[in-house]
UniProtKB/Swiss-Prot annotation:
SMART domains with a match to the protein in the record: Elp3 (SM00729)
Gene that specifies this protein: miaB
Catalyzed chemical reaction(s): N(6)-dimethylallyladenosine(37) in tRNA + (sulfur carrier)-SH + AH2 + 2 S-adenosyl-L-methionine = 2-methylsulfanyl-N(6)-dimethylallyladenosine(37) in tRNA + (sulfur carrier)-H + 5'-deoxyadenosine + L-methionine + A + S-adenosyl-L-homocysteine + 2 H(+)
Enzyme class: transferase
Pfam families linked to this entry: Radical_SAM (PF04055), TRAM (PF01938), UPF0004 (PF00919)
Higher taxonomy: Bacteria, Pseudomonadati, Pseudomonadota, Alphaproteobacteria, Hyphomicrobiales
Cross-referenced Gene3D superfamilies: Methylthiotransferase, N-terminal domain, tm_1862 like domain
Swiss-Prot/TrEMBL keywords: 4Fe-4S, Cytoplasm, Iron, Iron-sulfur, Metal-binding, S-adenosyl-L-methionine, Transferase, tRNA processing
Protein name: tRNA-2-methylthio-N(6)-dimethylallyladenosine synthase
Amino acid sequence: MTQETALLSTSPEGGDLNVPARKVFVKTYGCQMNVYDSDRMSDALSRDGYVATDVLEDADFVLLNTCHIREKAAEKVYSELGRLRELKKAKALEGREMLIGVAGCVAQAEGDEILRRVPAVDLVIGPQTYHRLPDALKRARAGQRIVETEYAIEDKFVHLPAPDKAKTRARGVTAFLTVQEGCDKFCTFCVVPYTRGSEVSRPVAQIVAEAEKLVEGGVREITLLGQNVNAWHGEGPHGREWSLGDLLRRLGEIDGLARLRYTTSHPRDMDDSLIEAHRSMAKLMPYLHLPVQSGSDRILKAMNRRHTAAEYLALVERIRAAQPDLALSGDFIVGFPGETDQDFEDTLRLVEEVNYAQAFSFKYSTRPGTPGAELKEQVPEDVKAKRLEILQALLVKQQRGFAEACVGREIDLLLEKPGRMPGQLVGRSPWLQPVNVDAKASQIGDIIRVRITKAGPNSLFAEMIGESDARS
C-alpha cells in the first residue's frame, strides 16, 4: 500500500474514498489526563475520516490540548498560537486550509478571550465538552467561530468511541484510563476546580468495558487517572457503594491485564479499602503518588489542605505497614505566601522522615482567580529559588538512594519499547523506574524476570534471568 493510499478517507459517513483524508496534528501539554484526552479526541475525529500526523506542516487541523497549572501557562499557549497563525497564513497563500483549535484547561479558563486575542483560532473547546469536537469542527469549517466551554449536562464518555483495537495496539502495552475528573478540595493555590469542575466519577460498568477493550488491544498495564482519583466512588453489585479499592479489585479480575496503577491521590481520600488493596493485590503496583505540598502545618492550613503534617506521616506509616515494598512519590510547593524559614525547615524535616523514591517540586506561582493570588506576604523570587534548590538536592539524593537500593533485586519487568542499543528493550519496574535490559529473545508486552545490575541517573539496568511469560 502506498503512502497516498494509506491516507485516503475512510469516513463512515460515506465520503469520497478518492479524496485524501484530512490530517490532524495534536500537541499535548501537561498531565497524563491530557494525554488520555488527546487520544480520545483523535479517536473521535477518526470517525469523520481524520488521520493523525506527526508533521505539523501537513495538518489540516491543529489542536493544542493545554494545561493551566503552571505559571504563564496561558501566555505560552498564546505564543504557540502566534507561530501557528503565521503557518496558517503561509498555507493560505498556497491555497491550503488549516484550522486551529484550542482544547484543555487554558481553553476552559480563557474561552472567548482566545478568539479575541488570536483571530486565527477557529474553535475553543473545554475538557468537559470535547466529545462535541467533531461537530464543532464541522461548524468551524463552515465559517463559524466556536467556543464550547460550558459544562455539559450529558456524559461525554457515552458519546466517545470505544478504544479502537488497532489504535490501542499502536499506542503500546500501557494505557491511561480516566475514571474521575474534577476536584472539590479547593486548595488555595490550584486552578483545577475552576477548569475541570467538581468531582465526577465514571460508572463501574463504563470503566470496566473500556478497560476490557484496552486489554483486547494488547494493553497489559492500565493507570487509572483522576484529578483526585481516590475520591472515585460508584455503585457496585446489589447497590453497594464502591470506592477506588473496590474498583481496582474488579479490574484485577480482567484476564490479560497484568498491572494496575492510579494517580493522583489526595491524603484525605486514602480509605481502608484502598490501603487493603495495596496489601492484597499483586496486580496493583507498589507505587503511590501522594502529594503533601508542605511539611508546615501553618502553610498546609493556608493552602486549605485540611490535614496536618502529622496526619500525613501517620497515613504513610499505615500504607507502608500494608505494603512494605511501597515506593512513595510526592509534590511540593516552596515559597507559598507567608512561608518562613521555619516553615521550609518543617518541609525538609517531613521529606527526611518519609524518604521519597521520587518527587516533584516547584516554586509557588500566582494563579489568577485562586485565593492564593490574593494572599499577602508573597515570598521574594530569590528566596523561592534558593529553597527550591535545597529541596531538590535532598529529593535527588533520596531518589538516587532508592535506585541504588534496587541493585541486586530480582523483579518482574514489563517490556514497553525498544532501547537505544541493538537487542535492548526498556520496561518499567514496579516502582515506575525505566529499566534497560538486553532481551533479544523477548518482545514488547512480555513480562520477564530480571536482576537489577546498575543504577543510572535516570534509569536502571538489568540482566534477564527468567523466560518471558506466555502470551495469549
